Amino acid sequence: KYTGNMAESPRWEVCLDSSASVFWKGMGRRYVDKTFSQAAKLYMEGMIENLKSEFQKMIEENTWMSQDTKKEAYLKLAAINKKIGYPDTDFTEDDIDKFYENYTMSEDHYYNNRVLNNKLSNLESILSLRKPVDKKEWSMAPYEVNAYYSRSVNEIAFPAGILQSPFFSQTFQDSMNYGAIGVVIGHEITHGFDDQGSQYDAKGNLRNWWQATDRENFVKRTQCIVNQNANFRVDEINMTLNGINTQGESVADNGGVKESF
């Protein structure tokens, strides 16, 4: 039965989430050392380049998009930055020790620990206002089982947490990897060209790089996905999906499968 009420999490989960919110960098280093090799990172780099090549072929074979818009699409595709496994900078043991040098925690004073953490986190946020944007910074911890595409910097990221079985393994056959993490990679690449991502250019600037007719054609072709989702009904709550709100994820899902296949 759907009630909308969230059950209280068990104490161990609360403690784990609380610790991870502060010590994500140290925990991430330990997780990577145990589960993710340099060879796996190189393998993933090859997969991403292969899927980008497939997406380029899809653009080339496209019959409804003008050459001017295709040219911009090629530039954006080529400029997509990839982040794999873990940060490439500020992730050594010395870097992490320096990062936490002011975090003097006590196992007997949880409240004081939280106050100190909030103080240091707020200070870090304030100081960052006077610093240039660090495009090497990650939006996820290395152990998270997730992936993302960022429109504002035109990048895709795959933490080490998702680069594990059953999504990915160097011991898998290529067909298994492309059928699992390959679809996820293609999904994130496609996000750069969905209803929202397509509004940003190769540098992550909000700019219309589409010819008007091409944009109209794109909207017409995504309508079938909108309609398909709008016809999906959940009888238990007497509601249907909002086809417009879900189109970005559905376009990315379809694109990911096509690229990976």
Predicted regions span which residues?
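Intrinsically disordered, low-complexity linker/terminal regions across diverse proteins
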Residues: 9, 13-16, 20-261
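Catalytic nucleotidyl-transfer cores of nucleotide-processing enzymes
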Residues: 1-6, 11
